[in-house]
């Protein structure tokens, strides 16, 4: 089944056909770095991380670019409030963002272009728009003349006449028309500034992404993504600038994530109803946060609550318990010389769930439906292990490989599937279990208890049974 993507531009699902066979070029709007990332930001970047992972899992080579807006009105305002240098403030929060994304197991982009390192590229882009008659210089900067671009509004479906009536227009003294937006802002006293043909100043927000995405991905590329709040004006203005400059369709698939909601309102810094990634990571494993996000389709609103996070935590524990059950069962599993009814049932459940998983992910990356298939395998394999005395290695291996594929796509279970490390760990743990058993035989209970306690601190729990000591991994 081909991958189908919901294209915001057409408001329908379309079969995904990249411009270059086997390769996907993808741009995701990155943060304006003036504060700590919150869960609303994380929702977007986890969603696009999983989309990228799935495309790679399906065999595509993905070139992913995500920008940093490291000069902006918000950065200047925050720097004035704190007394920091705007450059240092942006650098601090840029590093914090990268640290938080790494903690959340979001794979790094291939390129992270920063606005301040692309000023000449931005100036060249604006000059091209001027030469083509789409941009003009006003008293306070350079503006894009919206009404000259005939397709304006095709992404957001906003009509120009409605915009002129005052719907979300940007202020500016030098505008010819109220709907026009800034490409270059002339410097104000005390603000960071760069030399340009129009005097000292800095770029407008929208031109930055048009410039940096096309520099690294070309004048046409496959996927442009971001949050729903970027559809208008940001992405609408990006289309106008880029297609005016290049003279043809710019981006083929526009993808947008739904809002993270708190008590019926969008989580945002302006409303003060946000929880930072760092706050959550103090209380929850990063995989809990990922699973919380993946329990809803990326386009749907996601309601944040402590109960919702706890539900994700419990679900993650269920999956880890299943993995542990498989691992323990592997030690007594036998080669499959014969299958009986329990094996056929387990095999069919795994086979059908794998099919459902890929069908869901091919259908606009529907992680919520895909997760249902994951829990079907979890339930089926646990049921199988209660039905048989000696499980078959082939059944356990198929379940194990399914969870490994899920982990690769969803960014879960990473510690379980670093195989070489896991094998070495298991050999060492088994050796310590044997040493502890010998110590107990010799009545050296203090040392035996010491081994048990130290292993527990490392996430290994020992259980003494009539058949001997078994161990399992736990979250610490």
From Swiss-Prot:
Binds 1 zinc ion per subunit. The keyword Zinc applies. GO terms for biological process: cysteinyl-tRNA aminoacylation. A motif ('KMSKS' region) lies at residues 266-270. Zn(2+) binds at residues 29, 209, 234, 238. ATP binds at residue 269. Belongs to the class-I aminoacyl-tRNA synthetase family. This is Cysteine--tRNA ligase.
């Amino acid at each position: 089944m081909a991958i189908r993507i919901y294209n915001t531009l057409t408001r329908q699902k379309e079969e995904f056909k990249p411009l270059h066979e086997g390769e996907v070029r993808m741009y995701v709007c990155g943060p304006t770095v003036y504060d700590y990332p919150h869960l609303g930001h994380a929702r977007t970047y986890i969603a696009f991380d999983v989309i990228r992972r799935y495309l790679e899992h399906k065999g595509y080579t993905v070139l992913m670019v995500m920008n940093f807006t490291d000069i902006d009105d918000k950065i200047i305002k925050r720097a004035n409030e704190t007394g920091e240098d705007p450059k240092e403030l942006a650098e601090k929060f840029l590093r914090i963002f990268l640290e938080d994304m790494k903690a959340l197991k979001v794979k790094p982009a291939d390129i992270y272009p920063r606005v301040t390192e692309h000023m000449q590229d931005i100036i060249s882009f604006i000059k091209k728009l001027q030469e083509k008659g789409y941009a003009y210089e006003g008293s306070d900067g350079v503006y894009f003349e919206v009404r000259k671009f005939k397709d304006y509004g095709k992404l957001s479906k906003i009509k120009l006449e409605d915009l002129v009536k005052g719907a979300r227009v940007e202020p500016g003294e030098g505008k010819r028309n109220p709907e026009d937006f800034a490409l270059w802002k002339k410097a104000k006293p005390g603000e960071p500034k760069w030399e340009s043909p129009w005097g000292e100043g800095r770029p407008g927000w929208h031109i930055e992404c048009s410039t940096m995405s096309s520099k690294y991905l070309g004048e046409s590329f496959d996927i442009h993504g971001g949050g729903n709040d970027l559809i208008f004006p940001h992405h609408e203005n990006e289309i106008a600038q880029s297609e005016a400059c290049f003279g043809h369709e710019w981006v083929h698939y526009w993808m947008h994530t739904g809002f993270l909601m708190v008590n019926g309102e969008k989580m945002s810094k302006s409303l003060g109803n946000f929880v930072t990634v760092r706050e959550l990571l103090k209380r929850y494993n990063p995989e809990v946060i990922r699973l919380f996000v993946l329990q809803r389709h990326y386009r749907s609103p996601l309601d944040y609550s402590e109960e919702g996070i706890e539900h994700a935590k419990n679900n993650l524990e269920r999956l880890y318990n299943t993995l542990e059950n498989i691992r323990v069962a592997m030690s007594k599993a036998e080669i499959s010389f014969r299958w009986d009814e329990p094996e056929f049932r387990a095999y069919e459940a795994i086979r059908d769930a794998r099919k459902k998983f890929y069908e869901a992910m091919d259908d606009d990356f529907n992680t919520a439906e895909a997760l249902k298939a994951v829990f079907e395998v979890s339930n089926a394999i646990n049921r199988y292990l209660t039905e048989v005395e000696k499980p078959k290695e082939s059944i356990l291996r198929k379940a194990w490989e399914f969870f490994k594929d899920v982990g690769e796509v969803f960014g879960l279970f990473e510690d379980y599937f670093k195989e070489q490390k896991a094998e070495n760990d298991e050999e060492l743990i088994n050796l310590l279990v044997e040493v502890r058993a010998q110590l107990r035989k010799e009545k050296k209970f203090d040392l035996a208890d010491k081994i048990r306690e130290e292993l527990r601190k490392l996430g290994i729990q020992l259980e003494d049974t009539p058949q001997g000591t078994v161990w399992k991994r736990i979250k610490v």
